[in-house]
């Protein structure tokens, strides 16, 4: 039986690297107080360097915020960037927290189809048909949870063009970007949209097996 459920590596014997355990112990005494409101500077600097490796455009350390995990940051983004009644396009099937966080912030989740017959890719025509005067943003999850689909550059460019034409914020959930197999490559959508407002959400809990360390 393959348990394809919650993305929690530890119960399935995927342990955190020894380097993480060692550094946690060595830095425990220096970590008793509050950090900067945006997060620990050295961590944000490391994220900035990762963004540079992935060719994110125009990203500086001042653009980077850290939190207790992507789930919490999704909720904070919705609270900060949505007004009551704003509509947000969300993939279906989706990661349920997106729908819940949008509703909690007073927004309205509007689900667009990811087509099982087309490798679970977003249906661009369906996305376009659901845009109204209240549409504020579009969510993409790439690599996708729960389908596992990895979106090619051509599809991402189509999504960017829809966002560009309709002045939409793009929320891109990329928590699984380093768990790509079979020689495929993950492309951050922000690298294709230097002129748009893109919020990229990522973390270490899956790729570094540290879900409980947050």
Predicted regions, residues:
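N-terminal small-domain helix-loop-helix segment of the aminotransferase-like
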Residues: 1-69, 76
